[in-house]
Amino acid sequence: MKRTALLHADLSRAIAALGHGDMIVIGDAGLPIPPGPLRIDLAVTPGLPAVADVLAAVLSEMQVERALVATEAVERAGGALPGWAGALPVAPQTLSHEEFKRLTRDARAVVRTGECTPYANVILCAGVTF
């Protein structure tokens, strides 16, 4: 058995296969997933699992050099970053939700959560560990 927090085999495999600059998306239950990236559907019920929980597990294994969130997520939170963004190792950059959705096409994997908060999505860009 693995010793790290992330137990989901497909998600762990996707992270292990990342190269520098590759992207993984953690999305809410409503984020459209394009046909190209690996789809990892973790949604069980509304709210389960939450983006914050999946993000914590992913960050236990992934070196992140850049993160992206939709401007609409910040606007919806009254001008502040969503609470789960505090777990990110870097300050996220913002872009429109439409541009966010376009970038998901280039992601290596899109992880669907049960999160039902609008715009609760983040793109994680892989860094290097050396």
From Swiss-Prot:
Question: Which catalytic reaction applies to this protein?
Answer: beta-D-ribopyranose = beta-D-ribofuranose
Q: Which GO terms describe its cellular component?
A: cytosol
Q: What does this protein do?
A: Catalyzes the interconversion of beta-pyran and beta-furan forms of D-ribose.
Q: Where in the cell is it found?
A: Cytoplasm
Is the keyword Glycosyltransferase assigned to this protein?
no
Q: Which residues bind substrate?
A: D28, H97, Y119, A120, N121
Q: What organism is the protein native to?
A: Paracidovorax citrulli (strain AAC00-1) (Acidovorax citrulli)
UniProt xrefs under SUPFAM superfamilies:
RbsD-like (SSF102546)
Instruction: State the name under which the record lists this protein.
Output: D-ribose pyranase
State the encoding gene: rbsD
> What is this enzyme's EC?
5.4.99.62
Which UniProt keywords are present, listed alphabetically? Carbohydrate metabolism, Cytoplasm, Isomerase
Q: Which GO terms describe its molecular function?
A: D-ribose pyranase activity; intramolecular lyase activity; monosaccharide binding
